[in-house]
Amino acid sequence: MTIAIYAGSFDPVTNGHIDVLKGALRLADQVIVAIGMHPGKKPLFSFDERVALIEASAKAVLHKDAARVSVIAFDGLVIDAARKHGAQLMVRGLRDGTDLDYEMQMAGMNGTMAPELQTVFLPADPAVRTITATLVRQIASMGGDIKPFVPVAVAAALNTKFKS
């Protein structure tokens, strides 16, 4: 069985993240969505909220394939989380050349530290290429319409978060 790990902060999960997740499910039998926990960052959504949003979004968009997705938290190196959960592939989404430059450096370092773990780059669909969680949060905080950029459950959660 092929297991892939897809790491990020997912604060919040966007249609771009879901696009990468769909691609990962074409490559692997099981995909672990690994939410990085960074002590220096204060996320908008708690870990539990992000898990719930990822799971709800996966069910709504991926239907039966959502059963092949699990969500975990990790701190430290993603390669350690990958090893712990038996992943052979590390999936990374690419929006543009800037992402590629950074991700190539990370893949090189990860490849040196964990040669058994193969990094796979998935280019974002042009329809979601410009979406970032940071921009989504900014638009939502100013009352803008974020529905084109995030799954339905996430749009509702963002609207609730910024109305309170």
UniProtKB/Swiss-Prot annotation:
It is found in: Cytoplasm. GO terms for cellular component: cytoplasm. GO terms for biological process: coenzyme A biosynthetic process. One of its GO terms (molecular function) is ATP binding. It comes from the Bacteria. It catalyses: (R)-4'-phosphopantetheine + ATP + H(+) = 3'-dephospho-CoA + diphosphate. Its cofactor is Mg(2+). ATP binds at residues 9-10, 17, 93-95, 103, 128-134. Homohexamer. Reversibly transfers an adenylyl group from ATP to 4'-phosphopantetheine, yielding dephospho-CoA (dPCoA) and pyrophosphate. NCBIfam families: coaD_prev_kdtB, cyt_tran_rel. Belongs to the bacterial CoaD family. This is Phosphopantetheine adenylyltransferase. The lineage of its organism: Bacteria, Pseudomonadati, Pseudomonadota, Alphaproteobacteria, Hyphomicrobiales.
